[in-house]
């Protein structure tokens, strides 16, 4: 039997099992557990380009270098050069080339995206483990190694949204999302 036929057979059996439960019990199968409002609030931490919702705290690149060395260096390499993970720095002037290097400094349009992504996803082995001060500091460090801010520039809820990223005008804005009618 071909792979595609096997997939169809397996899907049919699985759907039949779900349908038989619905017929026999009168209820659809349930998966997982309901999420509480508190659980949703802990994960509802998105930060838009405006910086709305950024938490208190602050950090500089000088402070961020220490956080980076302890929690980022193993994956992102010295000064954000990459290996084994993607590089965070470099790539200036490469976006129009045949081999663009898309880094925080060359590609990302908003500094708030750096904070948002770092807070929710890094370090990859322990996401959501950095304090807000650590996220501000490591964000400042990544901006610094890309030549975007000075080493002692404080990053916080007021200053981070004001950072003008080199590729800010390289995108067609869809924020806030437009109607798709």
What function would you assign to each model-found segment?
Residues 125, 130-181:
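Flexible coil segments in periplasmic/lumen-exposed cytochrome c-class electron-transfer proteins
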């Amino acid at each position: 039997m071909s792979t595609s036929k096997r997939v169809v057979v397996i899907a049919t059996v699985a759907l039949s099992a779900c349908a038989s439960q619905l017929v026999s019990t009168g209820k659809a199968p349930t998966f997982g557990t309901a999420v509480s409002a508190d659980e949703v609030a802990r994960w509802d931490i998105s930060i838009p380009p405006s910086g709305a919702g950024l938490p208190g705290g602050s950090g500089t690149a000088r402070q961020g270098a220490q956080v980076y060395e302890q929690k980022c260096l193993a994956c992102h390499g010295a000064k954000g050069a990459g290996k084994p993970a993607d590089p965070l720095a470099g790539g200036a002037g490469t976006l129009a080339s045949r081999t663009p290097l898309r880094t925080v400094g060359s590609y990302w349009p908003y500094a708030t995206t750096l904070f948002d992504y770092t807070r929710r996803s890094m370090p990859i082995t322990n996401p959501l483990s950095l304090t807000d001060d650590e996220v501000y500091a490591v964000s400042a460090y990544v901006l610094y190694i890309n030549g975007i801010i000075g080493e002692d520039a404080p990053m916080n809820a007021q200053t981070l949204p004001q950072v003008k990223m080199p590729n800010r005008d390289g995108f067609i804005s869809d924020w806030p999302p437009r109607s798709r009618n």
